[in-house]
Amino acid sequence: MEKYIMSLDQGTTSSRCIIFNKKGEVVSVAQKEFTQIYPKAGWVEHDPLEIWGKQAGVAGEALNIARISPEQIAGIGITNQRETTVVWNKRTGMPIYNAIVWQCRRTAGYCDELREKGLDKTIKEKTGLMLDAYFSATKIKWILDNVEGARELAEKGDLLFGNIDTWLIWNMTKGKIHVTDYTNASRTMLFNIHELKWDEELLEILDIPKSMLPEVKPSSCVYGETDEILFGVSIPISGDAGDQQAALFGQTCFNAGMAKNTYGTGCFLLMNTGEKAVDSKNGLLTTIAVGIDGKVEYALEGSIFIGGAVIQWLRDELRMVKTAQETEKYATEVEDNNGVYLVPAFVGIGAPYWDSYARGTILGLTRGAKKEHIIRAALESMAYQTHDVLKAMEEDSGIELKALKVDGGACQNNFLMQFQSDILGVEVDRPEVVETTALGAAYLAGLAVGYWKDRNEISQNWAISRSFAPAMEDEKKEKLIKGWHKAVTKAMDWEDKE
């Protein structure tokens, strides 16, 4: 009887289930979107019960599509939108509030208060993260302080916290297992990434009872088994990692200096730094890449707020293109950018600049500038931003980038990938299987149950669909990068500070 691995990929807008075979190929996919809740400006929530319902639904659907029985699943891997926070009553199993999503800014004011007390340095040293409303810690505190009776229940030991991975595992095991992995724990702003444990001092500062927190385990191990009510049989739950870390693993970035970029709405860059937690001097995050083989490995992470979203903007707001795919055709119809630069700082600019007062700009316009030049400049902006983050990573880690592995929607744009390679001066590799996030979770699950022997076997699965080699002269490259940095300087500090 042929065996498979099931991957549950719980994202920000949809719940998916992908089933993989031994070669790491996709056998079936099922997906359901769920509701985005916006109670106030800047607030974002999800319904945890809806997420669990949809996730269980797509798991059954993926089995049906693949025409395989639950007995053929050797293990289940979970990957999830990181930082999103669920608090529930362990006696009833019911959430006491909606899940507060990573994008939600409601606790920004409280983060400012902590910053005024000088706690940002403590938090960075212990967790590797910047003090920000993005991470789970202040979201948990908000629920405890604002939901009636929450604090009393927490003090009594009746409340549990989890990111989405923890919430799914708890439901899949009918409340038997309250667990997370090192990668997800490292995104809570409560986990000491050097000592590998929940940090007592941070829990005290934020007034969060330790009894709420899940046990932290490796990213690849058997956490427990699914309750039989779910599939009719018990299946080991054996892999767990946050989405970006899962993608790094799925791209087989197993050695220090290997990096991947996910070109989504935003771009997420992670570089493996091995067993060394590199402290960033350039505004990058230090995070746990994976917990496996009795140790943890670390990564540097840089986020680009506006990646593929700049193409959506060209399509929906400026109506320059009908589909994202058309951008490649327009970009190649002109020889160069004609001196035009587009800095997509619509919501400020992220790593390594970190200026929330920057705003979007189009610079270098002359009478000869056409729509094609603006479209080309928009695509190029993704490559320039990626270049800036990777240079910061090289500087912090002291490791020179050899090649960049890519995934996400915009990696299908051949013009962008070639330009990315030219600007970086290294090879850009697009894999055959671009479902790298789900694949990473599947690999972690499969390793724990012996479906794959080791990372060497997995590395052999990784196949290049297309490789892009740098073909631009150094002088031209330096001139373009200089122009980009000049454009970024003009975009910065634009919005008036209140």
Swiss-Prot record:
One Pfam match? FGGY_N
Q: Which Gene3D superfamilies match?
A: 3.30.420.40
Catalyses: glycerol + ATP = sn-glycerol 3-phosphate + ADP + H(+)
Q: Name one GO cellular component term.
A: cytosol
| Amino-acid positions noted as binding ATP in the UniProt annotation, renumbered to this chain | 12-14, 265, 308, 312, 409
Q: What does the activity regulation annotation say? A: Activated by phosphorylation and inhibited by fructose 1,6-bisphosphate (FBP).
Which GO BP annotation is one of this protein's? glycerol catabolic process
Q: In which pathway does it act?
A: Polyol metabolism; glycerol degradation via glycerol kinase pathway; sn-glycerol 3-phosphate from glycerol: step 1/1
- In which residues is ADP bound? 12, 16, 265, 308, 409, 413
Give the record's keywords alphabetically: ATP-binding, Glycerol metabolism, Kinase, Nucleotide-binding, Transferase
Q: Which SUPFAM superfamilies match?
A: Actin-like ATPase domain
Q: Which residues bind sn-glycerol 3-phosphate?
A: 12, 82-83, 134, 243
User: Which terms does the record give in the GO molecular function aspect?
Assistant: ATP binding; glycerol kinase activity
Per UniProt, glycerol binds at 82-83, 134, 243-244
The EC number(s) this enzyme carries: 2.7.1.30
Primary role = Key enzyme in the regulation of glycerol uptake and metabolism. Catalyzes the phosphorylation of glycerol to yield sn-glycerol 3-phosphate.
Describe its partners and assembly state.
Homotetramer and homodimer (in equilibrium).
> What family is reported?
Belongs to the FGGY kinase family.
Its recorded name reads Glycerol kinase
Species per Swiss-Prot/TrEMBL record: Clostridium botulinum (strain Kyoto / Type A2)
| Upper lineage | Bacteria, Bacillati, Bacillota, Clostridia, Eubacteriales
